[in-house]
Amino acid sequence: MAGSLGNLVVAGGGESSDSEEDYWDIGYMDRPPQTTKGSLATEERDETFKKALTSGDVSLVEELLNSGMSVESSFQFGWTPLMCAVNIANVELVRILLDRGANASFDKDQYTILMAACAAHASESQILKTVELLLSRNANPNVACRKCMTPVMYAAREGHAQVVALLVAHGAEINAQDENGYTALTWAARHGHKSVVLKLLELGANKTIQTKDGKTAGEIAKRNKHPELFTLLSLTVNPLQGKLQHLTKEEAICRLLTTDGDAGKEHKFSSYTAFGDLEVFLHGLGLEHMTELLKERDITLRQLLTMRKEDFTENGITNIRDQQKILDAVKELQVEEIKFGELTEVINLEISSDEFLNFLLKLNKQCGHLTTAVQNIINQLPVNSHKIVLEWGSSQRFTSVCENLVCNVEDLGEEVCKLKDLIQKLQNDQKNDPCRVLPMETYSTWNSRFLKRATFTVCGFGFLLFIFKLTFRKS
């Protein structure tokens, strides 16, 4: 094949989950040329045809086809002209060949035209147009090669998020596995393609599927040193799970190809918008339809978590099921305001020691809960900023609130110290007060002992007197 066709392309069925470097070199082969004039002329025509294809010479390709060159000519390694055209994602040539009758479902050793297009050496926009053209000619997106890899896996491996979305919209099985158990999500995670991972999660990819060696996509990302993807894939709740799963094919394609201006002609997809904490919470509960409503009313996650039923109605959340979902989630998260009104009242000077002790114990328990909550947040926050997957607001707001918290904690500490000193002073004054009335239990203990002894003595004398009289009468 021509020198420009010497690009490395994935071999038909020669892919491996352990090494993505298995390629074919479809360049020249060192072998002596044919000597017969007929075969020499044919080889020259084939060589000219291949050069025209790889250089994108549309007029020459059409001229050769008009002169009798077959649209299904077999080049080196059994490749057809269409295979060569999609390998460089030349949309115009692909369209010409298809219009001339080229087979969009052709495969060489189970390596299909569509697979070659997904692994092409070109820009994603060109690959996207090529793939869409092939799909319009009934190319099957679920055919697998000898290693059980499908076109969506090739696209995910190469990092083409838009191509992945288009294939899935046309019915590609998103959770299919190759011979080593890799899915499209696993391939994207392995190569660190964040945009593809996000798109696959949005399309409903299952991140819990394991490879044959028992690894999930997140663990594969971690093993290949992609900590950001590992963090994203390790989230308990998938904020993007299956957003487009329940759409029809036409609706999904429309959603995926919706852009501004002339972007629709260029088949560009809207970029992924990072999720904030409110969006993650709502998506986790299946309440993503409330996102716009809450944003319009400037309701933050913190405000949402502290709302009551009457607050929901006032803010337009009228669906009882939606209200209950939020309330159940709040209860599960144990997010609640400290209601000091429920603590024991201590303003009464006649309060008993048991009630006062109960108040202090409750206050101490609340402080312990707050400390544990802060410790949990510290343990969950990543050390490095590049590991943060979800969008955050200005860090200045967070640090400002933390500074206020520190001041409040210091004030609380000072007040508790004052309370402790006051209690200690009261105890010391009571001990040193000469007019102090002894506790009732002290007197009761001494009196009870005296009464017991007196009673025992009287009973003893009475018993002896009775015995003495009885003996005297008998005698």
From Swiss-Prot:
* Gene3D superfamilies for the chain: Ankyrin repeat-containing domain, Transcription Factor, Ets-1
Please report the residue spans annotated as repeat (ANK): 44-73, 77-106, 109-146, 147-176, 180-209, 213-242
Q: Which keywords accompany this UniProt record?
A: ANK repeat, Cytoplasm, Developmental protein, Differentiation, Meiosis, Phosphoprotein, Repeat, RNA-mediated gene silencing, Spermatogenesis
Q: Which SUPFAM superfamilies does this chain map to?
A: Ankyrin repeat, SAM/Pointed domain
Where are the annotated segments for Disordered? 1-24
A single Gene Ontology CC term: pi-body
Phosphoserine modification, residue list: 16-17, 19
Q: Would I find Nucleotide-binding among this entry's keywords?
A: no
Q: Where in the cell is it found?
A: Cytoplasm
User: What does the subunit section of this Swiss-Prot or TrEMBL entry state?
Assistant: Interacts with DDX4, PIWIL1, RANBP9 and TDRD1.
> What protein does this entry describe?
Ankyrin repeat, SAM and basic leucine zipper domain-containing protein 1
Q: Give the organism the record lists.
A: Notamacropus eugenii
Encoding gene, per UniProt annotation: ASZ1
